[in-house]
Regions:
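Short, exposed beta-strand-loop hairpins at the edges of beta-sheets
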Residues: 104, 108, 114-123
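Pocket-edge positions in alpha/beta enzyme catalytic cores
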Residues: 23, 77, 104-107
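Bacterial N-terminal signal peptides that target proteins for export
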Residues: 1-10
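Boundary at the C-terminal end of the N-terminal hydrophobic targeting segment
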Residues: 19, 23-25
Length: 129
């Protein structure tokens, strides 16, 4: 009996450990829909009220030539990686106190992941016009 309980416990723990692997992959198509919120101020290929997102991944924050960033963003020393974008998109004002980006953030981790997948695909400098 004790062996059966032990075996059942091992199987239960193995199943729980594997459940994390079932997390859904980021979806660039869904991210395009999330980006519609950003499009009020941003565009992929050109500056608007906010800077363009073409070539965003790997770019230093506050570095698009000709765009007037806040001092906080220019001096942030952030290089836009997936992790840096995730932190910023969750709460821009917490990530860069003094940023001029007047957006509260995206609380949903899955929406942020989708948006980042879209930005990586659409913002690839080889594809930007």
């Amino acid at each position: 009996m004790r062996a059966k309980v032990l075996a059942a416990s091992v199987l239960l723990l193995a199943g729980a450990a594997g459940a994390g692997n079932l997390a859904r992959a980021a979806d660039a198509k869904a991210g395009e829909a999330v980006y519609e919120r950003c499009a009020a101020c941003h565009a992929i290929g050109h500056d608007r009220a906010g800077p363009r997102h073409c070539g965003l991944i790997g770019r230093r924050a506050g570095s698009v030539p000709g765009f007037e960033y806040s001092e906080a963003m220019r001096s942030s020393k952030i290089v836009w990686s997936e992790a840096a974008l995730d932190r910023f998109l969750a709460n821009p004002m917490k990530a860069v106190p003094g940023t001029s980006m007047g957006y509260a953030g995206i609380p949903s981790a899955s929406e942020r992941a989708d948006l980042i997948a879209y930005l990586k695909a659409a913002g690839d400098p080889r594809r930007c016009r």
